[in-house]
Amino acid sequence: MDDCLSAGIAYLETNEDIALASPYAENALGQKQYLCKRYPSIFTFLVRGFAPSALRRIFRQRLALFEMHDLSESTPTDDVTIASGCFMLCRTDKLNAIHGFDENYFLYFEDFDLSLRLAGVGKIAYVPEMKIRHSGGNSANKGWQHIKMFARSGVRFFNTHGWRFFKQQ
């Protein structure tokens, strides 16, 4: 995990069509985290955020598809739709072309929105040679205020990029 930036910069230098590179991530316990996502459906978010664990187990395959569990741990791909905001290595010219983050998002969905807008000017890549330790996350599990902020940003995201109730990418 020592040379994440060097690996990312080298990847961007040899792949000029990439607008954003997302790394391989582990939490503090060394467990893999899934930073790349497919376009979500409302149903997937409801199951992921609010369903009891028994129901989540029933939809385990659907959730794994959303979180792109099928990505290789050794081979980069430029077939990513959304990258987590915990680490985004972006080309400055591409970020400037879309005017950066949309200030209308607060705390949630700003990374989803940025990823989709960057995909309009380049590709989003998963680069497993870039390795990080991510100790954050789970901000959605912090009470009703966060649920309200999540819902507000979610409505903004889906109003902007399109509502999908059951079908995900």
Residue spans for each PLM region:
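Short, flexible active-site-adjacent loop segments at beta-strand->alpha-helix junctions, enriched
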Residues: 24-27, 36-39, 86, 111, ...
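Residues that scaffold the ATP/ADP-binding catalytic core of kinase and kinase-like folds
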Residues: 35, 46-49, 97-98, 117, ...
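Short, hinge-like loop/turn segments at secondary-structure boundaries
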Residues: 36-42, 142-145
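Short, flexible, basic/aromatic active-site loop/helix in glycosyltransferases
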Residues: 40-80
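Active-site-adjacent helix/loop segment of glycosyltransferases
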Residues: 112-116, 120-169
